[in-house]
Regions:
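Catalytic palm subdomain of template-directed nucleic-acid polymerases
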Residues: 81-83, 87
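Structural preference for beta-strand elements that scaffold enzyme active sites
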Residues: 31-35, 72-74, 116-118, 146-148
Length: 177
């Protein structure tokens, strides 16, 4: 949902992370890792390889400038699932090939071909198989009829804060309600 580093609420600037690595090395840190959280629920096959390239280049730069022993790079999540009918699902094989390509182009020539890569693909792996179960907790009849549920903006802040797409409705038969 966010994909501009200047808008990210987490993390450090390039200058800050370089300084942080230097400080940590001076205090005795021997191994380092890099982690990113830049976007959520991207529905493009290009995002993850692009993020990998940025992080891999950052890792090489940090190794060269600070001498840090970078053991892992966590690409975080971000690979989304289609919520809207007009959205195509991501091609996880194309994404994997893209990440492998930049790994081999950036990290391997820099002598960093042993850096572990981590991902956090919970939404991609589990999202299509889950369901939201909610309970009607009150009814309001004014000019229209409303049903209040226990899964509203107070309970589900992502749609309210980031404009995430709402869930689809499953229509139940009368005897199932």
């Amino acid at each position: 949902i966010m994909d501009n580093p200047g808008d990210a609420k987490y993390g450090m600037t390039t200058e800050q992370i370089t300084e942080a690595f230097k400080i940590l090395k001076s205090k005795g840190a021997k191994e380092f890792g890099i982690h990113a959280f830049l976007a959520s629920n991207t529905v493009t096959n290009d995002y993850y390889p692009m993020l990998a390239k940025v992080l891999f280049e950052q890792a090489v730069r940090l190794k060269n400038e600070t001498g840090a022993n970078i053991k892992f790079i966590n690409l975080s999540g971000g690979i989304g699932i289609p919520y809207r009918p007009d959205q195509e699902p991501n091609d996880i094989y194309a994404i994997g090939k893209g990440v492998r390509k930049v790994y081999e182009e950036v990290l391997v020539p820099a002598g960093m071909g042993d850096v572990a890569i981590f991902t956090e693909l919970g939404r991609y792996m589990m999202g299509p198989y889950g369901c939201l179960v909610t309970k009607a907790i009150h009814e309001k009849k004014t000019y229209k009829d409303y049903i209040g549920v226990d899964a509203c903006a107070v309970n589900l802040m992502r749609p309210a804060m980031y404009g995430a797409y709402p869930v689809s409705y499953t229509h139940l038969r009368a005897h199932e309600t």
